[in-house]
Amino acid sequence: VAGEMEQQYEALAEQGKTPLFFVRDGHPMGIIAVADAIKEDSAQAIAELQHMGIDVYMITGDNEKTAQAIAKQAGVTHVIAGVLPDGKEAVIRRLKTEGRVAMVGDGINDAPALTRADLGIAIGAGADVAIDAADVVLMKSRLTDVSAAIRLGRATLRNIHENLFWAFFYNIICIPLAAGFY
């Protein structure tokens, strides 16, 4: 029976499900599996972020097989599995040594990592503590809004840089020219 349950465990985990065993007096009685359904726009959101040149990581407490199966469905290539709730913040700290990091989360366990990231993005339907910890709150639960928010931020920054250029140009060139004519 143990061998059969082990095979069932492996099969369920490879499907992105978390197997749970029922045990009575130390003997396995059965196995069921639970699974989170990925958001229907996950694959599109991941593809958009990757097209923007952003490396996407999935940081999860799920076991490696379950995490890999979910990542495959969503199109994520970098998976860090088996992370305890306190560990997400440490992972973000490590990733920050490689460059700028944005973190998207919706739960209580995500709050420290959202705070640690250069940009914390909370899903609006998430826990209040995650929303309070984030820099940006997505009002809807659409993951495609993450790439839209990043595009908006980049466009805003580009506009600021252009305005600063013209302000300095005016102050350095035009004001002395105007002063010379009086």
Regions found by a protein language model. Give the residues of each.
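Conserved ATP-binding TGD loop and adjacent catalytic N/P-domain core of P-type ATPases
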Residues: 8, 12-18, 22-162
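Helix-interface capping motifs at the ends of transmembrane segments in multi-pass membrane proteins
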Residues: 165-182
